[in-house]
Amino acid sequence: MGIKVYKPTTNGRRNMTGSDFAEITTSTPEKSLLVSMSKTAGRNNTGRITVRHHGGGHKRKYRVIDFKRTTDNVVAKVATIEYDPNRTANIALIVYSNGVKSYILAPKGLEVGMTVVSGPEADIKVGNALPLANIPVGTLIHNIELKPGKGGQLVRSAGASAQVLGSEGKYTLVRLQSGEVRMILSTCRATIGVVGNEQQSLINLGKAGRTRHMGIRPTVRGSVMNPNDHPHGGGEGRQPVGRKSPMTPWGKPALGLKTRNKKAKSSKLIVRRIND
């Protein structure tokens, strides 16, 4: 992926950058793998906002991604590399030798015409999926399962990767992108390689309109609200927070407060936390 820099022909275009989409091979998705999406604008069934800053945006269709990769020992050929509006990573359309088509996350280095396969006997090659127990120490992986057969849940965004550090009993030690070291069942599957489109984080949207096209609404500062809307609100002119520390709109400390559930059963599987 390359970064395209726009000429400053207008104020909105100044400093704007975007992807050159050099890796994309087609603009037409596989129709059988598309699902309609309805917008909720962050509202629940009662019509109240439960997620702020959601709404608007370009109409999308969901691409059904195969995060499980359970079609074992059947070779699949990469047909296309496509753009997916629902995620930062690109996706690859693969066609199995039995004719079945599916989408997978496109790892770095995967190209049209290459083959991928899943299963315990699969080679350690980019795009192949196999159990953690069969992956050598030091290998970079992505799309990692937390429960066997549930499908990949970790390391799925553009440019992300994790590294296998070793095994301990029925668990495999994996260092995640954040630096956290976690024990994951060795029967869980992962895909070899780094997620592609790694320069996506360097894109400068340049103007508010591009953010609105993505379905993200403005974030309003609490200090410019009324006191009944936010703990920081009210006062004549610009005023300080007026509390010991900044607060969330619901009156809880906004900075430094640990949000992890102390009773989470998975805590015993975390060997090294992010800040240790």
From Swiss-Prot:
Keyword Nucleotide-binding: no
GO BP field: cytoplasmic translation
This protein's UniProt keywords: Ribonucleoprotein, Ribosomal protein, RNA-binding, rRNA-binding
rRNA-binding as UniProt keyword: yes
Gene3D superfamilies in the cross-refs: 2.30.30.30, Nucleic acid-binding proteins (2.40.50.140), Ribosomal protein L2, domain 3 (4.10.950.10)
SMART domains, per the entry: Ribosomal_L2, Ribosomal_L2_C
TM ranges: none
Molecular-function annotations in GO: rRNA binding; structural constituent of ribosome; transferase activity
GO terms under cellular component: large ribosomal subunit
Chain segments carrying region Disordered: 219-268
Entries under Pfam families matching the protein: Ribosomal_L2 (PF00181), Ribosomal_L2_C (PF03947)
Subunit annotation: Part of the 50S ribosomal subunit. Forms a bridge to the 30S subunit in the 70S ribosome.
Task performed by this protein: One of the primary rRNA binding proteins. Required for association of the 30S and 50S subunits to form the 70S ribosome, for tRNA binding and peptide bond formation. It has been suggested to have peptidyltransferase activity; this is somewhat controversial. Makes several contacts with the 16S rRNA in the 70S ribosome.
Family from the record: Belongs to the universal ribosomal protein uL2 family.
Protein's UniProt name: Large ribosomal subunit protein uL2
Native source organism of the sequence: Lactococcus lactis subsp. lactis (strain IL1403) (Streptococcus lactis)
Gene name per UniProt: rplB
